[in-house]
Amino acid sequence: MPREKVRVLIVDDSASVRQILQTILNDDPDIEVMGTASDPFAAARRLQNEIPDVMILDIEMPRMDGMTFLRKIMAQRPIPVIICSSLTEEGSNVMFEAFEAGAVDIVPKPKIDTRQALLECSTRLREAVKSAARARVRPRAERRVVEKKLTADAIIPPPVQGKVRPTTERIVCIGASTGGTEALNDVLEMLPPHCPPLLIVQHMPAGFTAAFARRLDSVCQIRVKEAEDGEPVLPGSAYIAPGARHMLLQRIGLRYQIAIKDGPPVSRHRPSVDVLFRSAAQHAGANALGVIMTGMGDDGARGMLEMRKLGASTRAQDEDSCVVFGMPKEAIAHGGVEKVVPLHHIPREIMLWYQAGHVAVAG
């Protein structure tokens, strides 16, 4: 029996954008655009008759802006919503409001200036739609091109057993995707100032992560910033991988520092969780804790197994608290997960692991 297609409603005031999005999505045999709307009022009329699996929504529209419509939808009849908008530094705060209001993902409007740019945008959009269709949403208050899937070998060589130099410094590496922006907020705001350093890969487009880091920094006790190449890794700080670039952990003597590298997508993502986790296995070994959180796909599964093989502790977010139980599920299936915990237990797990290491060193 053929698999049912993901049915999508597109809401955007630009006729050309609606047409481009419709063409991109209908080219995928697993997706069907059930209709389009030029504004939220037209979309609301459409929703009275049929409910899509996923809605793609613009932010800036006449008569009613997308944010207001998103809040109404999530309060009255929640469905997975993807924000498709022009990403700018000035508009980043609006994007975070969208996540808080219940949007499951954000994608940039397709670029059609080059064939490669259009291909990358098309692939990202189709993957976002399929991921959103599997997302859990809760009520809130008011022909396909298959890319070669690269592994972390494209960026960093495999870790070698017995080659990790000793250090007493402990470090936490976290990977997340769909649903991760709010989940990371929940984790980081509960950590005390004396927590271990955290390196975080959250799948995000370029130009978005600096504002994300500033937003987290404003609500957390710890320092949160966008990671920079060559900067030292310090306790009480969290470092967010910049969008569209890989982040790696490195060692200078007994001290950790961050490396930011260009390169092809790994596990179809850049930044890639697999790349970060492999570098942690290579340079931190048993002094690392790997945490994999909500998200679609398998990025991080191989890297987490490499971490565990070299002595690291590992945790995965449980299915009930995930927006999409994809990345944790794959990491568990690969055998890389030591313990599965709900989202609200992750801060405690981090601190218990960190404090246990301090006791061991003191002893």
Curated annotation (Swiss-Prot):
It comes from the Bacteria. GO terms for biological process: chemotaxis. It catalyses: [protein]-L-glutamate 5-O-methyl ester + H2O = L-glutamyl-[protein] + methanol + H(+); L-glutaminyl-[protein] + H2O = L-glutamyl-[protein] + NH4(+). Its EC number is 3.1.1.61, 3.5.1.44. InterPro entries: CheB-like, CheB_C, CheY-like_superfamily, Sig_transdc_resp-reg_Me-estase, Sig_transdc_resp-reg_receiver. PANTHER family: PROTEIN-GLUTAMATE METHYLESTERASE/PROTEIN-GLUTAMINE GLUTAMINASE (PTHR42872), PROTEIN-GLUTAMATE METHYLESTERASE_PROTEIN-GLUTAMINE GLUTAMINASE (PTHR42872:SF6). B.japonicum does not have a chemotaxis group 1 operon. Involved in chemotaxis. Part of a chemotaxis signal transduction system that modulates chemotaxis in response to various stimuli. Catalyzes the demethylation of specific methylglutamate residues introduced into the chemoreceptors (methyl-accepting chemotaxis proteins or MCP) by CheR. Also mediates the irreversible deamidation of specific glutamine residues to glutamic acid. Contains a C-terminal catalytic domain, and an N-terminal region which modulates catalytic activity. This is Protein-glutamate methylesterase/protein-glutamine glutaminase of group 3 operon. It comes from Bradyrhizobium diazoefficiens (strain JCM 10833 / BCRC 13528 / IAM 13628 / NBRC 14792 / USDA 110). The gene is cheB3.
